[in-house]
Amino acid sequence: MLKTKVKVSAIENLSDARYCAGMGVEWLGFSMTEVPVDKFNEIRNWLSGIQIVGEAFNCSEDQIIALCEAYQPDVLEINSSVQLEKIKHLNCPKILRVNLDSDNLPALFAAARPYVDYFLLVGDSEDSLLGFEDQVEIWSAQYPIILGLS
């Protein structure tokens, strides 16, 4: 079993979902704009003890609300372009995907913290985290951080 909380993204089939669940993955992410709701529900019904994350990237706030009503994920993952005030009423934990290479992270962390449960740090390349180790440690002491690795 895993010793660290892990989120796997872009799950599209039951085989991958069951493998990840068997390994003890904490969160399984499904694109709510790419995986049909019936397939999403079919996969979800086979799983237990794992948090299902509905990924909604590059969607308007109204689209996110509609997707959450249709898919009813355990957790919602959005990117930093979303106006969090407009989706704060959604009754599920939120993961905000932030980019080390392009987002103003200190300001974003402070502004978004009242609205989100976790910050998922990603970058534009595999090397994005290089040189940020000390800063990530500082941020992790202040905010709930998940590291995104490719």
Please describe what each predicted stretch is.
Residues 1-150:
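Conserved N-terminal beta1-alpha1 strand-loop-helix module at the mouth
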